[in-house]
Amino acid sequence: MDYFTLFGLPARYQLDTQALSLRFQDLQRQYHPDKFASGSLAEQLAAVQQSATINQAWQTLRHPLMRAEYLLSLHGFDLASEQHTVRDTAFLMEQLELREELDEIEQAKDEARLESFIKRVKKMFDTRHQLMVEQLDNEAWDAAADTVRKLRFLDKLRSSAEQLEEKLLDF
């Protein structure tokens, strides 16, 4: 059973996050291992396995990039373990330049420039994220998979910039 079905939700990117949360809480109560403590060993094991599946499904569906990757996996794109990389050389060059810029910001300990950099990367991420949503809505799986690969780069870059921000603010 796929995660969307487990949660009683349609298999699409855009979800009712409140319904997702409520269903998660309901499933947790229903399959919590403590509820099966007096049951047979097989029932206890099944409850533990079901609880683990519910938790994994929850983590996957609530995180936007993980949800997109999972939805794509249902359509034959295993982005989590694939060796396929981004082939857009302009995008890759841009990523290298952004990484170099982040390194320069770190060397200079330039908080103002870092703040501007983070805003710029967030805007790039948001623009590409909106494109991905449209591609998934239109079932343009190949294009969406490529966009998700690019979003991974931007997400890592954003995370690195935010870690640098914390580091600079701690001084």
From Swiss-Prot:
One of its GO terms (cellular component) is iron-sulfur cluster transfer complex. Belongs to the HscB family. Co-chaperone involved in the maturation of iron-sulfur cluster-containing proteins. Seems to help targeting proteins to be folded toward HscA. PANTHER family: IRON-SULFUR CLUSTER CO-CHAPERONE PROTEIN HSCB (PTHR14021:SF15). One of its GO terms (biological process) is protein complex oligomerization. It comes from Shigella flexneri. Residues 2-74 form the J domain. Signal peptide: none annotated. One of its GO terms (molecular function) is ATPase activator activity. Interacts with HscA and stimulates its ATPase activity. Interacts with IscU. The keyword Cell wall biogenesis/degradation does not apply. Pfam families: HSCB_C (PF07743). The lineage of its organism: Bacteria, Pseudomonadati, Pseudomonadota, Gammaproteobacteria, Enterobacterales. Keywords: Chaperone. InterPro entries: DnaJ_domain, HscB, HscB_C_sf, HscB_oligo_C, J_dom_sf. This is Co-chaperone protein HscB.
